Swiss-Prot record:
Family per record: Belongs to the PpiC/parvulin rotamase family. PIN4 subfamily.
Necessary for association with the pre-rRNP complexes: annotated segments: 1-41
Effect of residue 19 to E: Does not abolish nuclear localization and reduces DNA-binding ability
Subunit structure: Isoform 1 is found in pre-ribosomal ribonucleoprotein (pre-rRNP) complexes.
Keyword annotations of the record: Cytoplasm, Cytoskeleton, DNA-binding, Isomerase, Mitochondrion, Nucleus, Phosphoprotein, Rotamase, Ubl conjugation
Protein name: Peptidyl-prolyl cis-trans isomerase NIMA-interacting 4
Function according to Swiss-Prot or TrEMBL: Isoform 1 is involved as a ribosomal RNA processing factor in ribosome biogenesis. Binds to tightly bent AT-rich stretches of double-stranded DNA.
Listed PANTHER family: PTHR45995
Compositional bias annotation for Gly residues: 7-18
Enzyme class, broadest EC rank: isomerase
Comment field on protein domains: The PPIase domain enhances mitochondrial targeting.
Lineage: Eukaryota, Metazoa, Chordata, Craniata, Vertebrata
Length: 131
């Protein structure tokens, strides 16, 4: 039993080091996982086939806002811009995806692939800012 205790304390030591690396992980997530608000754009389509067409356009190099204007069924904002959204103001799967994405720009968007399914339909999401 004492060796187990020793390895347990060894684990605690490692745990201390791991917590150090946890803070490093949190710093590494800074551009990705942190913050309480994200500036989001999305493309929303009810039909899977249509969202996949939009995905192909994005992959071929078409700008995100142009694809959103052409394909998105969410007419609330042109270009798919939802503005700043806070944690808790988005549906679960959309929020998880939005906070997992790195910040990117129109020229080289990083977006959800495959699209995210919610009760509203299928979303391709990109994040333009985080705070």
């Amino acid at each position: 039993m004492p060796p187990k205790g020793k390895s347990g304390s060894g684990k605690a030591g490692k745990g201390g080091a791991a917590s150090g690396s946890d803070s490093a992980d949190k710093k590494a997530q800074g551009p990705k996982g942190g913050g309480n608000a994200v500036k989001v754009r999305h493309i929303l389509c009810e039909k899977h086939g249509k969202i996949m067409e939009a995905m192909e356009k994005l992959k071929s190099g078409m700008r995100f806002n142009e694809v959103a204007a052409q394909y998105s069924e969410d007419k609330a904002r042109q270009g798919g811009d939802l503005g700043w959204m806070t944690r808790g103001s988005m549906v679960g799967p959309f929020q998880e995806a939005a906070f997992a994405l790195p910040v990117s720009g129109m020229d080289k968007p990083v977006f959800t692939d495959p699209p995210v399914k919610t009760k509203f339909g299928y979303h391709i999401i990109m994040v333009e800012g985080r705070k």
